[in-house]
């Protein structure tokens, strides 16, 4: 495990998170039905620049991510530059790290600033579950390539004769992990059984998340970090997340059937995140450049870590591996944190990680530590609600977490906060921010 990180540039300046913004998050096929991830990305980056009153020519790089790729626009970052008011000379490239994608884009920009290669950049991510790349079967794809090479009508006819009716059916994007064949929901169900997570506890966490998110919106706490999004044909707009159960009642959660193991399961649609559309972004600068331009940053990056574990062994345990590494690099312990933001992909996954944070056995056997990461103080944990309520556009969640924890720390007078997430492929991400 790496020792303490020194996240300052050659002049001793920290990485400033100047501001962050996101679209409202919307359930699949609702407010953003027909709006691509690229269009949502352009929306949020344009608005972020506008609100920051920053000359676009000063932005040296955009690193942006997407999980559900658009074949027509594989480099979403560059398309955002070309499709907004940004200067065409702005460098741009795309990244993907499953549900930790915008953690990665943020770190990439931060590292470029740390090396002195630049001083101002934007990072973020966007995903649409409503505009999907619908593919074709392998046999049809093979046949289409052969058709392109065929010269005669007879050759083309023989190629068509190889196909059956089922080969002509469209193929939606895979929801299963490529290596295991398991969906994320099946993995969460597996974790619920491994760690004895009860249905009642899962439902209680989901109810808490929706209740806190409702209170957060009603208190106006998200006004600075969520934009109003106007969508074609521009007769309506969305300015609030539409997955939140504003009248959440705990007893109603018990009525839903298990979604992934019908007979013996406990993971339901109510204690899982739904397929979601949305985009988010953060503006990063060197501390000196931010102050020279008159900005008061919402926070600074103190440390970060990425980890990977076996996909066959409860692969959504990323926070339990990445968090202790980020804490060590920051020279901190869990109890030193003011706030903790953990991505709630599923209530089962979240509760399993929370359980392992407090497990000395897990720490000794899996982390090589002689003490547990620490028991989570619920008064610090996801205090504004989490992904179970807000939703989860895969590539957008990381920068939502980072922005949200910075703003809440600011409201509380400063401190340090953890943002952490699991990701497909057994990946994990954690970032510690400090706010003055």
From Swiss-Prot:
It is found in: Cytoplasm. Keywords: Acyltransferase, Cytoplasm, Fatty acid metabolism, Lipid degradation, Lipid metabolism, Transferase. One of its GO terms (biological process) is fatty acid beta-oxidation. This is 3-ketoacyl-CoA thiolase. Catalyzes the final step of fatty acid oxidation in which acetyl-CoA is released and the CoA ester of a fatty acid two carbons shorter is formed. Pathway: Lipid metabolism; fatty acid beta-oxidation. One of its GO terms (cellular component) is cytosol. Its EC number is 2.3.1.16. Heterotetramer of two alpha chains (FadJ) and two beta chains (FadI). It is an enzyme of class 2 (transferase). The active site is at 99 (acyl-thioester intermediate), 392 (proton acceptor), 422 (proton acceptor). It comes from the Bacteria. It comes from Shewanella piezotolerans (strain WP3 / JCM 13877). CDD domains: thiolase (cd00751). The gene is fadI. Pfam families: Thiolase_C, Thiolase_N. It catalyses: an acyl-CoA + acetyl-CoA = a 3-oxoacyl-CoA + CoA. Belongs to the thiolase-like superfamily. Thiolase family. GO terms for molecular function: acetyl-CoA C-acyltransferase activity.
């Amino acid at each position: 495990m790496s020792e303490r990180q020194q996240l300052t540039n050659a002049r001793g300046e920290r990485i400033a998170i100047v501001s962050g913004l996101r679209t409202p998050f919307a359930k699949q096929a609702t407010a953003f039905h027909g709006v691509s991830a690229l269009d949502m990305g352009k929306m949020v980056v344009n608005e972020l620049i506008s609100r920051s009153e920053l000359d676009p020519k000063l932005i040296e790089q955009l690193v942006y991510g997407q999980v559900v790729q658009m074949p027509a626009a594989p480099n979403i970052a560059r398309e955002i530059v070309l499709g907004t008011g940004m200067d065409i000379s702005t460098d741009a490239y795309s990244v993907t790290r499953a549900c930790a994608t915008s953690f990665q884009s943020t770190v990439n920009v931060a590292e470029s600033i740390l090396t002195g290669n630049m001083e101002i950049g934007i990072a973020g991510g966007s995903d649409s579950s409503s505009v999907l790349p619908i593919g074709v079967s392998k046999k049809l794809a093979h046949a289409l390539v052969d058709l392109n090479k065929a010269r005669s009508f007879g050759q083309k006819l023989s190629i068509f004769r190889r196909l059956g009716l089922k080969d002509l059916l469209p193929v939606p994007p895979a929801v299963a992990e490529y290596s295991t064949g398991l969906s994320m929901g099946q993995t969460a169900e597996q974790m619920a059984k491994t760690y004895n997570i009860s249905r009642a506890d899962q439902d209680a966490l989901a109810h808490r998340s929706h209740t806190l998110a409702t209170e957060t919106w009603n208190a106006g706490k998200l006004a600075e970090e969520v934009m109003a999004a106007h969508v074609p044909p521009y007769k309506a707009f969305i300015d609030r997340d539409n997955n939140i159960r504003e009248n959440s009642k705990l007893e109603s959660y018990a009525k839903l059937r298990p979604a992934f193991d019908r007979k013996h399961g406990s993971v339901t649609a109510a204690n899982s995140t739904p397929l979601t559309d949305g985009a988010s972004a953060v503006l990063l600068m060197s501390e000196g450049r931010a102050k020279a331009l008159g900005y008061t940053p919402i926070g600074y990056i103190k440390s970060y870590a990425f980890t990977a574990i076996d996909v066959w062994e409860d692969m959504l345990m990323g926070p339990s591996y990445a968090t202790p590494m980020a804490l060590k690099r920051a020279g901190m312990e869990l109890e030193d944190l003011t706030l903790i933001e953990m991505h709630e992909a599923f209530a089962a996954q979240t509760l399993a990680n929370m359980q392992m944070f407090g497990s000395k056995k897990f720490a000794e056997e899996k982390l090589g530590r002689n003490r547990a990461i620490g028991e989570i103080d619920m008064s610090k944990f996801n205090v504004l609600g989490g992904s179970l309520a807000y939703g989860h556009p895969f590539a957008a969640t990381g920068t939502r977490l980072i922005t949200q924890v910075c703003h809440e720390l600011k409201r509380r007078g400063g401190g340090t906060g953890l943002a952490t997430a699991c990701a497909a492929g057994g990946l994990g991400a954690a970032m510690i921010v400090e706010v003055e």
